Amino acid sequence: MSIRHFKYLNMWIIRAFLVYLYNKKNMQSSIMSDFVVYLKLEPYLSQWLHHHLGDPVRFPDGSNENAVIRRFLMKLPPGKKPDLAANDLTAICIPDSKAKPCSRFNHLGPRGKLAVKGVIEDLFRQNLWCDLRGITDAGSLSMKIQAWCEMHGIDEQSHEAIRQKYYRMRKAYSEKGIFLVHRRAKRTDN
């Protein structure tokens, strides 16, 4: 084997090893545990999460939601039993972490659950606002919200709650002088 062939062989071995290390690191960072926490959410939030993130809900790596979950995870207090699945509870996967291995840190206290619920509601509002903000100028907003619900896996019973949520968001800003929807000029035809 010539020196040139030896250099190419070494280069390929080093490259293969670096690819192996890169894949190993990325696989470890994206591992979600089989441990879950259960949250009581509004039905439309639960349906929306299941539609986009599966059941149990798995937030993307590096997401704000996973950061909040990790921040408030704690060991199960002595004498307390873990939460069990129920029809009205949403299962959310605990992200694995070197600092807080989920085999030991797999409990969210009441305030931790409120914090996670808060970031989920924020994410929902952002998605709702981003999707509907450009199409509210013309036509029936109610029909557009129904279509949005259908597109995001939310049943028809939740349509009215989501419509009211959207109107409350828009009204809160308009009361402060921030108009997020185009205002129409009044016609002055005689």
Report the location of each language-model feature.
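Short, basic interhelical loop/turn and adjoining N-cap
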Residues: C149-A161
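Short, basic alpha-helical nucleic acid-contact segments in DNA-binding proteins
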Residues: K165-L180
